[in-house]
Amino acid sequence: MTKKVAIILADEFEDIELTSPKEALENAGFETEVIGDTEKHELVGKHGEKVTVDVSIADAKPENYDALLIPGGFSPDHLRGDEEGRYGTFTKYFTQNDVPTFAICHGPLLLVDTDDLKGRTITGVINVRKDLSNAGAHVVDESVVIDNNIVTSRVPDDLDDFNREIIKKLKA
């Protein structure tokens, strides 16, 4: 059976941090589904990339996915602003059940909402590192960091390393 990766997303995502890993996953034979507020709604990235939501967060069931991808940009901040906390709850399923969880740039911010960063080693773009540290994570400045089921990366320049490691994690 083909492994399926959930991608949680809102407007103003960092375009390449969605398109590059999504393409790498699909080229490696994995299925991806974009999850957002409203099914069939079109989301627009910071640089104009458009993507359609496949499944609404209200209908998405984390147990139906083999991994989670959280691209960066301003999307994670919008997701964290969900009044019902649905994206944090969705993400927490993956972190607490040792399901592969991939986050790049600002994406690791959503991991703060899981209350599951204490003692974890992760990375992210420089301006989110203080938040990650305050949540109990050991934050390092490396292109890609793997801590059990969580794979994090810093910026678009790290995408080759990030993509390689998320594919490796899913093939394990």
Swiss-Prot record:
SUPFAM superfamilies: Class I glutamine amidotransferase-like. It holds the Pfam family DJ-1_PfpI. Residues 3-171 form the PfpI endopeptidase domain. It comes from the Bacteria. Disulfide bonds: none annotated. Belongs to the peptidase C56 family. This is Uncharacterized protein SSP1625. It comes from Staphylococcus saprophyticus subsp. saprophyticus (strain ATCC 15305 / DSM 20229 / NCIMB 8711 / NCTC 7292 / S-41).
